[in-house]
Every structure is written in C-alpha cells, then in structure tokens.
Design a protein with these regions (language model features):
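Short beta-strand-to-loop capping motifs
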Residues: 9-11, 55-61, 97-100
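Glycine-/small-residue-rich active-site loops that bind phosphorylated ligands and cofactors
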Residues: 14
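Short, surface-exposed acidic-centric catalytic microdomains
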Residues: 17, 21-63
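Flexible, gly/pro- and Lys/Arg-enriched active-site loops
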Residues: 35, 42-51, 64-67, 72-114
C-alpha cells in the first residue's frame, strides 16, 4: 500500500545549490511534484533568507522509515547536529503529512506543526 506524503524543504546556506541537490536525491527514489520556490526571512535568529518549497509523492515506506531516509539525505548533504532549532541550515526536510495519519510521539509529529 502507498501513501501520499508532503514534505517541506528549506535552506539558507547556498540554498540554490542545496535545493537542486535535494531534488536529485528525492527524484532518484520517488516521482515527486514540487511547488514553486519562495523566499522567507530567517526567524528567531540573524541569518540569510531561506529558500523554501513543498513537494509531494507516493511512498510505500512507513513513516519512521521515511523519516530515517530524509535524515540520511540531510546528513549526506552536510547537515550537522548543531543545525537545529533556530539556526541556519544546509537543508531542512520536514515530513508535513503522511496520508491521513495523525501521530504525536517522540519520533513523529504528523501533521507537522512546523
């Protein structure tokens, strides 16, 4: 069984390059539809503007497996443990929706409140 998922994607460190790169990773694994890219100012800290977009695709991965896959991509792209909270990011991939699933646990927050 597959589920339709939605991700948010953001970067403010060399964002054009990093968004292009994350699209390559995602396109290798899924048939992805992307929104337009939009710019937002950094909030809660002093930093460069973010480039953001949303994407959707169908997956047979369960939510925890997909979350792990997304974390692997972030790590491959150079995201480090100190790039959390309100800080600059090489790449930020957030699972916004996973089908009709509602999960509020330590591992999952779906639908995402971010």
């Amino acid at each position: 069984m597959t589920e339709k998922v939605f991700l948010s994607i953001g970067s403010n460190l060399d964002p054009e390059k990093n968004i292009d790169q994350v699209k390559i990773y995602l396109d290798r694994a899924f048939k992805v539809s992307y929104s337009s890219i939009y710019k937002t100012p950094a909030e809660g800290f002093s930093g460069e503007d973010f480039l953001n977009l949303v994407c959707s695709f169908e997956t047979s991965m369960d939510p925890l497996e997909l979350r792990g896959f997304l974390k692997e991509i972030e790590e491959k792209m150079g995201r480090t443990i100190d790039q959390k909270g309100m800080s600059s990011r090489v790449i930020d991939l957030d699972l916004i929706l996973y089908g009709n699933l509602i999960a509020k646990t330590e591992q999952l927050d779906i639908p995402s409140e971010d």
